[in-house]
Regions:
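A short, structured loop/turn motif at beta-sheet edges
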Residues: 182, 232-236, 263-270
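Histone-fold recognition with a strong bias for associated Lys/Arg-rich disordered tails
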Residues: 1-179, 184, 197
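Histidine-centered catalytic/metal-binding microenvironments
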Residues: 200
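Hydrophobic pocket/interface hotspot
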Residues: 185-189, 195, 214, 274, ...
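A conserved amphipathic terminal alpha-helix motif
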Residues: 288-317
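Glycine-rich portal/gate segments that line the openings of hydrophobic small-molecule binding cavities
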Residues: 196-197, 205-254, 310-315
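Well-ordered beta-strand positions in beta-sheet-rich domains
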Residues: 173-175, 224-226, 258-260
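Beta-strand/loop substructures that line and gate deep hydrophobic ligand-binding cavities in soluble
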Residues: 245-298
Length: 317
C-alpha cells in the first residue's frame, strides 16, 4: 500500500505545484499534497485548525515574504493567481533534490502521519514555519503524530443494505478524512463527470455523454451498467448514494453495486464514510466474492484519495 500512497502523495504535490505554475515540486508542495490526499495527517492537522485552504494561504504568504526580502513585489507575473490543474498544461514531474530525498525517506508504510513528521523534521524548517504561522506548535504536533494510528484506515465488512441490493450480496465500509469543506465534497461525489475518477477505470470503459451509462470491458467480455444517484440530508450529514444497474442481458434493470457516502463536517474538513455494496450473481459470483472483496478494499482506498484530489483541485484558494 505504501507504493500506492506514495503515488497519490507525489501526484497531489505535482498538482499543487502546477496550480501556481511552479516548475519544481518542493517541501511546501509535499506538505500541501498530504492535506490534499487526506487521511490521518490531515485529520490531525484539522484538529489543530489547519485545512488545505489555510495551508495554501500560508504557503502563498511565505512566498510573498521571501520576495519582499529580495526587494521584489508580488505582482501577477511573479506570483500568478492559482488555477485548477485541469485548466493547465502539465509539465513533467520535477522536484528539488531535498523534495526527492524527503519522498524517499518518508516512512509511508506507517502512514501519512509519519510522512508529516518527516517533513516537520526537515532541516530547512519550511513546514515548521508554515505550522507556526497557522498557529500550531510543531513540537506538540510531533508528539501527537508519534502516537497516531497507522494507515490506511481499516476497511471493515458490514451488512449490506437490502433496500439497495437483493441477496446474495456483501458490503464493506471505509472512513476517511478530507481537508476540504463538506459541501464541496458532496458536490464532487454527486457529479457524474467525476465518476471516472473513482467509480471505474476509464481505460477499460466507455461512457455516454451523461457519464452515467458505462460499458465495462474485461478481455472479450463486456457489461453495460447505468448509474444514478440520490442526495439527501440525514441529521447534520449529507448522504450521496450511487447505484449501478445492469443495462442488458438476463439481469437487465437489476441493481449490481452501490456506493453510499455519508459526508459530515469535521474539524478543518470532512469525515467521509463510504459503504460499497456488491451483488453476487449465481455460483460463480459467490465463488469470486472473496477476490472481489479484496479488490474492493484496494479500490475504496484509491477512491477516497482520488475524491480528495478532485475536491482539492476544485477549491479556488
Amino acid at each position: 500500500m505504501s507504493m500506492l500512497l506514495t503515488s497519490r502523495w507525489t501526484g497531489a504535490a505535482h498538482l499543487e505545484a502546477a496550480r501556481t505554475r511552479t516548475t519544481e515540486i518542493d517541501v511546501d508542495h509535499l506538505y500541501l499534497g498530504l492535506l490534499a490526499v487526506g487521511g490521518q495527517a490531515a485529520r490531525i492537522l484539522g484538529r489543530h485548525g489547519v485545512s488545505l485552504t489555510s495551508a495554501r494561504r500560508r504557503v502563498r504568504e511565505a512566498l510573498i515574504d521571501d520576495l519582499a526580502t529580495l526587494g521584489l513585489q508580488a505582482t501577477g507575473d511573479v506570483v500568478p493567481p492559482p488555477k485548477a490543474a485541469r485548466e493547465l498544461d502539465f509539465a513533467d514531474w520535477r522536484a528539488t533534490s531535498r523534495a526527492h530525498d524527503l519522498v524517499n525517506r518518508a516512512p509511508l508504510r506507517k502512514g501519512t502521519a509519519a510522512a508529516l513528521a518527516t517533513l516537520i523534521a526537515e532541516p530547512s524548517g519550511v513546514v515548521r514555519h508554515l505550522l507556526v504561522t497557522d498557529g500550531v506548535d510543531p513540537d506538540q504536533l510531533m508528539t501527537e503524530l508519534a502516537s497516531a494510528p497507522t494507515e490506511p484506515d481499516p476497511v471493515e465488512r458490514v451488512a449490506y443494505d437490502p433496500s439497495l441490493l437483493p441477496a446474495p450480496a456483501w458490503a464493506k465500509r471505509l472512513r476517511h478524512y478530507l481537508s476540504s469543506p463538506p459541501d464541496l465534497v458532496a458536490d464532487a461525489i454527486a457529479d457524474a463527470a467525476l465518476l471516472a475518477a473513482w467509480a471505474y477505470d476509464p481505460n477499460k470503459a466507455q461512457v455516454d455523454d451523461s457519464g452515467e451509462t458505462i460499458r465495462h470491458t474485461r478481455g472479450s467480455r463486456t457489461m453495460t451498467v447505468r448509474a444514478h444517484h440520490t442526495r439527501r440530508r440525514e441529521g447534520e450529514a449529507e448522504v450521496v448514494t450511487w447505484i449501478q444497474e445492469v443495462a442488458s442481458g438476463a439481469h437487465a434493470g437489476q441493481p449490481l453495486h452501490y456506493d453510499r457516502f455519508v459526508v459530515a463536517a469535521a474539524p478543518g474538513g470532512t469525515e467521509l464514510l463510504h459503504t460499497a455494496g456488491q451483488r453476487s450473481f449465481g455460483l460463480l459470483g459467490r465463488l469470486t466474492a472473496p477476490l472481489a472483496g479484496w479488490f474492493s478494499w484496494v479500490g475504496m482506498q484509491y477512491a477516497a484519495q482520488r475524491i480528495g484530489l478532485e475536491v482539492a483541485d476544485r477549491q479556488a484558494a
